[in-house]
């Protein structure tokens, strides 16, 4: 199997350690590709809309995004990690996710995404990790992923692993290993189930794209939906099973 990891920081702190513990269960049976932000996607999205209007290859940062996109599409499991900064994911993670706006269901979602699983790992000193995880989940779910595991925690005492109490270290280790075992025992030869919320999103966007495509057959998103057969009877979660 293939695992693609997007690290929201280059720092090797508590989040990094938790990620390493999660991956330990997979190291003998998976090809793991990791990206570190901002190094592997260093620039901000400038909102030019080229990706949505002209195609993702016209993005000024295509040299970075195309490589990562390929890894994401080839992955059976996507792991996204980020420490919590002021109740949110890192700025580098937000900048990364902005580059993939064209992959949202209202635009040109990849059918492969609808059969994938994903895991989000985040923590913080105090509160805020849940809202940070929500930042990432928002994009993953709008990419079409239904099966998303989430690990969050409030450290409270310190942000350095070695300075945490043994009790806290044991608690974090136990929880992340439990999540790892859960995802390690999945049969990745079978696509994940697409939930009703995701299907509803597709249904709503299909009506929108059908109307737009009728009035402007050359509009990129509408053409994509038509080519995929989604304006007819085909659906993204059926496409990726074929």
Question: Residue spans of the language-model regions?
Answer:
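N-terminal beta1-alpha1-beta2 submodule of the flavodoxin-like/Rossmannoid cofactor-binding fold
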Residues: 1-109, 148, 170-242
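Short, solvent-exposed coil/turn elements at secondary-structure transition points
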Residues: 38-40, 124, 153-156
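A short beta-to-alpha transition loop/helix N-cap that caps and shapes the active-site region
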Residues: 41-44, 127-129, 158-160
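A short secondary-structure junction signal
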Residues: 91, 129-134, 161-163
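Short, glycine-/small-residue-rich phosphate/pyrophosphate-handling segment
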Residues: 109-152
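Short, surface-exposed loop/turn motifs that are enriched in glycine and acidic residues
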Residues: 122-126, 162-169
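Active-site rim beta-loop-alpha module in soluble metabolic enzymes
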Residues: 154-159, 165
